[in-house]
C-alpha cells in the first residue's frame, strides 16, 4: 500500500505556521477533524495522550504523531511541512519541520503499526525528506509522497 493510500491531496499542509509542539498538534487535530468528521477535541486529546507516553519525533526533523479513535472508519493520514522547525522533544535534539499525523480506528491493530512503519521508513529517507523540504505547494509534496522509495531516492 503506497503512502498516498493514507493521505489525500487535501490532507497536505505545505507551510503550517506554528510556534510549539502543542500548537502543531492543535492545528493538525483541527484539520484532521475537518477532513474525517471526527470531534476536534477528541482528536487533540488522543494525540496529547500519546505524546505523554513519549515523543513521536523520530529524529532527522521528522515527527509522526498518532493515535486511535473509536468512531474512525479507516486509517487516515495528514502531512504538514512546517514553515519553520519547532522543538518536538526529539531524542536526537533536532527541531521538527516534517510532520505526518496518523489516525486509526480503535481495532486497526497490525494495520496501524504497518502504516507507522511505512511512514517512518519513507520520511527517514534523507533524499525524500530533502525533496519534501524543498516542495512549496501541496501538489508538489503529494507527488514526492507518491514516489516509490527507490524512485524517490
Curated annotation (Swiss-Prot):
One of its GO terms (biological process) is phosphoenolpyruvate-dependent sugar phosphotransferase system. Coiled coil: none annotated. PANTHER family: NITROGEN REGULATORY PROTEIN (PTHR47738:SF1), PTS SYSTEM FRUCTOSE-LIKE EIIA COMPONENT-RELATED (PTHR47738). Seems to have a role in regulating nitrogen assimilation. It is found in: Cytoplasm. Residues 5-148 form the PTS EIIA type-2 domain. It comes from the Bacteria. Keywords: Cytoplasm, Kinase, Transferase. The active site is at residue 66. This is Nitrogen regulatory protein. Pfam families: PTS_EIIA_2 (PF00359). One of its GO terms (cellular component) is cytoplasm. The gene is ptsN. It comes from Bradyrhizobium diazoefficiens (strain JCM 10833 / BCRC 13528 / IAM 13628 / NBRC 14792 / USDA 110). Transmembrane segments: none annotated. GO terms for molecular function: kinase activity; protein kinase activator activity; protein-N(PI)-phosphohistidine-sugar phosphotransferase activity. InterPro entries: PTrfase/Anion_transptr, PTS_EIIA_type-2_dom, PTS_Nitro_regul, PTS_SugarTrans_NitroReg.
Amino acid at each position: 500500500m503506497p503512502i498516498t493510500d493514507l493521505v489525500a491531496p487535501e490532507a497536505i499542509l505545505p507551510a503550517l505556521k506554528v510556534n510549539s509542539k502543542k500548537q502543531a498538534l492543535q492545528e493538525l487535530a483541527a484539520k484532521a477533524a475537518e477532513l474525517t468528521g471526527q470531534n476536534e477535541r477528541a482528536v487533540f486529546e488522543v494525540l496529547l495522550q500519546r505524546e505523554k507516553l513519549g515523543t513521536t519525533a523520530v529524529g532527522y526533523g521528522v515527527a509522526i504523531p498518532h493515535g486511535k479513535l473509536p468512531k474512525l472508519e479507516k486509517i487516515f493520514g495528514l502531512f504538514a511541512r512546517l514553515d519553520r522547525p519547532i522543538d518536538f522533544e526529539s531524542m536526537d535534539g533536532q527541531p521538527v519541520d516534517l510532520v505526518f499525523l496518523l489516525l486509526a480506528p480503535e481495532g486497526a491493530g497490525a494495520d496501524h503499526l504497518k502504516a507507522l512503519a511505512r511512514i517512518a521508513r519513507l520520511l527517514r529517507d534523507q533524499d525524500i525528506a530533502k525533496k519534501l523540504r524543498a516542495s512549496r505547494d501541496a501538489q508538489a509534496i503529494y507527488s514526492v509522497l507518491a514516489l516509490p522509495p527507490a524512485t524517490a531516492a
